[in-house]
Amino acid sequence: MTTFKEAVTFKDVAVFFTEEELGLLDPAQRKLYQDVMLENFTNLLSVGHQPFHPFHFLREEKFWMMETATQREGNSGGKTIAEAGPHEDCPCQQIWEQTASDLTQSQDSIINNSHFFEQGDVPSQVEAGLSIIHTGQKPSQNGKCKQSFSDVAIFDPPQQFHSGEKSHTCNECGKSFCYISALRIHQRVHLREKLSKCDMRGKEFSQSSCLQTRERVHTGEKPFKCEQCGKGFRCRAILQVHCKLHTGEKPYICEKCGRAFIHDFQLQKHQIIHTGEKPFKCEICGKSFCLRSSLNRHCMVHTAEKLYKSEECGKGFTDSLDLHKHQIIHTGQKPYNCKECGKSFRWSSYLLIHQRIHSGEKPYRCEECGKGYISKSGLNLHQRVHTGERPYNCKECGKSFSRASSILNHKKLHCRKKPFKCEDCGKRLVHRSFCKDQQGDHNGENSSKCEDCGKRYKRRLNLDIILSLFLNDM
């Protein structure tokens, strides 16, 4: 037989709770504790019969107090299990020894019927096998990994491990495990009851604090206020993120364009702009997006009902935030001001793009010619020069344009609309730029003088034509 110095004891697998800790356990947790402790006894003492149930120290849903390892060392004589009362120290070693004594007959039978011992072992050696739990002897050995075990029940699982057999299946999700102890640990996931439930949406939460935060979405309550600007937030974590806006702390910097961000996930999203990758595609219209969240938001345009409508123009939106942004157009509010020139903007994104004019930053560059732009949309328009793309077609004459603004101006020629009027002569014009040129003709700003003959021309173009003709004659 193979002998090991260290024995597997009840202390190695037992879970100890104080009286205060036991009072905090809910029924599901108590049931889980019972199952785990029962499995611990089974793994170490399973011989097919167990006359003493390890949870006899549960009486009227009150746990008997188990002493710690220090208390066991100093306790020379204690009460028997039957004599110990509730909340009295019941030595774990005493439970161990009495249980092993009760199992002598059944364990002796299994040992005799197993191949614990080699041929030639005498009956006295079999008798010695009854104390294998206390001595730490592990006579059984796995032939594949040479690991030794103290009884047949513990000897079997390693064989299941080598064969890959998973005979223990979870009834909740169907997942299988080699060991029943692993199954017990897995079942703790299902035992975590979701105690908190939202009354509005019916969504369940494992913590009451998460439920309170969720309910504030419906009630509009924002108890956490920023001391700098007074803005309110539903939870403290969002307030902490907001406070970084005032401190200016942006530790995450993009290596390509130098733009800084408060959080690392913001930097990761930003870096997709430089790669140009758009892996998420809408199945309905074919439009592609960099982020899955952007695709999900876009899909609502096709599927979701537009519950939020503008009172001014009746336009519908799927999100209240989009409606709020749209209403700024009707109010004319421009809350975002440039500190350099004082120009105002409706959106913070517009202000950010405008500030690049002052800083000279052009993070978007054309791969064909290297020309830089302050916005992604500007780069997209420029790339049509190289590709020759003209997606905007006039239905009247079939003429194509690369910009939406160009086709809008072109359509005015067909409908004969002349919305712009010269303040000096009253002449109506198609484009605003024509109106400015007309006013320049009246005040003399557009006139150009020839240096050779002194004659003045309304347009610089007319002067250039005359000069070219004069040079050809020479």
Swiss-Prot record:
Residue stretches making up the KRAB domain: 8-76
What are the boundaries of the region KRNB?
Answer: 80-167
Q: Give residue ranges of zinc fingers (C2H2-type).
A: 168-190, 196-218, 224-246, 252-274, 280-302, 308-330, 336-358, 364-386, 392-414, 420-442
What is the name of the protein in this document?
A: Zinc finger protein 230
Q: Which UniProt keywords apply?
A: DNA-binding, Metal-binding, Nucleus, Repeat, Transcription, Transcription regulation, Zinc, Zinc-finger
Q: Does the keyword Nucleus apply?
A: yes
For whether the record's keyword set contains Transcription regulation, the answer is yes
Query: Which species is listed as the source?
Result: Homo sapiens (Human)
